[in-house]
Amino acid sequence: MKYMIITVVILFTCALKMFCEETEEENHLAIPEDPYPSLPLRNYSCNNMACPLKHICGCMPTPITPETPFRDLDCGCYHEFDMMPVCV
């Protein structure tokens, strides 16, 4: 009887450990939900960006609006003298 109880405890411990490992793995693989799915993707880098003559690549903060109540960065080509975005 004593060995049966020990066996049951060991099996229960192993099963619990396997369940916990699967849960950690599932959490690791879970893709976080995008809190702002309707917002367009922004470019956060000037790498490999070719800007026209007299323009520079830079990152400017976006304005805070009711639709986007947080500060974001928008990287792209800007006029060198006034940092206004280049219209494509």
UniProtKB/Swiss-Prot annotation:
Primary localization class, coarse: secreted
GO cellular component: extracellular region
Taxonomic superkingdom: Eukaryota
Post-translational modification: Contains 3 disulfide bonds.
Location relative to the cell: Secreted
Alphabetical UniProt keywords: Disulfide bond, Secreted, Signal, Toxin
Signal peptide: 1-20
Expression sites by tissue: Expressed by the venom gland.
MF-aspect GO terms: toxin activity
Family: Belongs to the scoloptoxin-12 family.
Official protein name in the record: U-scoloptoxin(12)-Sa1a
